[in-house]
Amino acid sequence: MATLLSVRRARWRDYLELTKPKVVVLMLITSLAGMFLATRAGVSWSVLLFGNLGIGLCAGGAAVVNHVVDRRIDALMARTHKRPLAQGRVEPLPALLFALALALLGMVLLLVFTNALTAWLTLASLLGYAVLYTGFLKRATPQNIVIGGLAGAAPPLLGWVAVSGHVSAEPLLLVLIIFAWTPPHFWALAIHRKEEYAKADIPMLPVTHGERYTKLHILLYTLILLAVSLLPYAIHMSGPLYLACALGLGLRFLHWAWVLYRSSRPHAAIGTFKYSIGYLFALFIALLLDHYLLLSL
């Protein structure tokens, strides 16, 4: 009985792992920010709860499809070889059915508790990641994460539209921030895992163009990100608190990118990658804090 229960727990954990919960949580932080930034009043509990649940379920479904498509690649890479599908703990067909169930439930929640525009934009984001990026771009071009990054940048727009019911310039600016953040984030990881990507025949930029070229582009994109991150203040979407945070966080990110560009230290790339995660989290928290500070004035 104890053995049977441990197997069941492992299966439950395997299916949870397929949804990439840590990635989904970061996405939901940005969708939450989009929701709260969209209004001067409070967000209704139904939109807050079921809107984010729907977005999260669809994101989880897309992540499962990514695991299915990449299972052979994952088996070749040290970072991913222990994933459930790569090790055969979950079969592809049950995983795809699980992905379909997550996506359908997410779409139903969005249609019922938010609005049709949010649901269709979420579906477009899901298909962009699961089909366009995972199925084609990842194996086709070293610009895979630049082109495919738009799908991963959508959550703040989805959260905003869930509350407002329409697309406007402000949420598109939030999308632009994540879009500019994506290349330095993933290319830093790609440098750290260059040999693994080469072994799996994935044309990541460090594999196709070399580390020096990639480091230069990380530096350039970090400069672009710093400039883009100041636009919410420039258009009076945010105030001085956000400006100070964006400058501090952005300059620190630029420092990491410069160190990576100038240094051959083996841990510089993974250090840049880890900082980029904290950067995005802190930047969106700053947006929220500034928003409610402005409302209280």
UniProtKB/Swiss-Prot annotation:
Membrane-crossing segments per the record: 23-43, 45-65, 93-113, 117-137, 145-165, 171-191, 216-236, 241-261, 277-297
Assigned GO CC terms: plasma membrane
Chief location category: membrane
EC number: 2.5.1.141
GO biological process terms, semicolon-separated: heme O biosynthetic process
Claim: Cell membrane is one of the keywords in the record: yes
Gene3D superfamilies according to UniProt: UbiA prenyltransferase
Annotated keywords: Cell inner membrane, Cell membrane, Heme biosynthesis, Membrane, Transferase, Transmembrane, Transmembrane helix
Membrane topology according to the record: Multi-pass membrane protein
Broadest EC class assigned to this enzyme: transferase
InterPro entries: Protohaem_IX_farnesylTrfase, UbiA_prenyltransferase, UbiA_prenylTrfase_CS, UbiA_sf
Coiled-coil regions, chain positions: none
Pathway field: Porphyrin-containing compound metabolism; heme O biosynthesis; heme O from protoheme: step 1/1
Entry's Gene Ontology molecular function annotations: protoheme IX farnesyltransferase activity
Cellular compartment(s): Cell inner membrane
Catalysis: reaction(s): heme b + (2E,6E)-farnesyl diphosphate + H2O = Fe(II)-heme o + diphosphate
Other observations noted: Carbon 2 of the heme B porphyrin ring is defined according to the Fischer nomenclature.
PANTHER family the UniProt entry points to: 4-HYDROXYBENZOATE SOLANESYLTRANSFERASE, PROTOHEME IX FARNESYLTRANSFERASE, MITOCHONDRIAL
Function of the protein: Converts heme B (protoheme IX) to heme O by substitution of the vinyl group on carbon 2 of heme B porphyrin ring with a hydroxyethyl farnesyl side group.
Family note: Belongs to the UbiA prenyltransferase family. Protoheme IX farnesyltransferase subfamily.
Protein name: Protoheme IX farnesyltransferase 1
Protein species of origin: Pseudomonas putida (strain ATCC 700007 / DSM 6899 / JCM 31910 / BCRC 17059 / LMG 24140 / F1)
